[in-house]
Amino acid sequence: MPLLRFDVIEGRDEKSLQLLLDTAHQAMVEAFGVPERDRYQIVHQHPANELIIQDAGLGFQRTKDMVIISMTSKARTESQKEKLYALLAERLEKKCEISPDDLMVSITENGDADWSFGLGEAQFLNGKL
């Protein structure tokens, strides 16, 4: 049940944001094999001066269309992560017109004890999930 946070520069319309979220979710479902219904996404829009993402010497040309995806998820294999990165870059460019130069992804891994979906319970630990 990955939790995805999208940080973008403010000013995107609702339709383009929804397409971004839908496209990223489909890539995650395919790369990680999570159920379609497991969808947890947060969008945070920032003024341009609040997102300072330099190219780290890799030659990226960042624009106002920059997207940072921060994911919290249980452990995944390197090949699953590489597949996700490739699918995101390919599909966001094709469907959302977001250049691969404008995509940054970070994954933080956690375990079953690190999730509560409500009611003060750890559903992965108590067998409800």
Curated annotation (Swiss-Prot):
Keywords: Isomerase. It comes from the Bacteria. Its EC number is 5.3.2.-. It is an enzyme of class 5 (isomerase). GO terms for molecular function: isomerase activity. InterPro entries: Tauto_MSAD (IPR037479), Tautomerase/MIF_sf (IPR014347). The active site is at residue 2. Belongs to the 4-oxalocrotonate tautomerase family. This is Probable tautomerase YolI. The gene is yolI.
